[in-house]
């Protein structure tokens, strides 16, 4: 399948012994995965922040968040290495144009005692359900399950399609070992 992947880091916390690495994976044009990994000394509480267009209506659900805008709707779910994730909805000032601040819907997602957070956003084409299921990640060469601090996997079922995503947080095996979920294995940091 086709996908787009970007990886970068934020060095603003290096003086505190923390390097933030962000990976963004776009699967087709309607599934976006944002994975933040804190390297070094992990902060006790980690967070991700999101701002939305002023016309978007947000509602929390048992699975995460639903959003409805002027032309689209979306679902968001949040994961933090099996730790509890808290959501806080509010508003925040945002400038889309020079010197024109507006209050827009804002979401903060927090978790404690984790080294990574993953947000999965699915742009919905209809009202059919979106299912995002955490999956155990396996190393085929050593025939064992990796712990969430080593890797996390997700199966995303939406818009009539099914995708699997794996994030490795540390090297597991060597460059010839396969890591994966649901019987599908591949090389690299993201499959």
Q: What name fits each language-model region?
A:
Residues 1-191:
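CBM-like, beta-strand-rich accessory domains located in the C-terminal region of large
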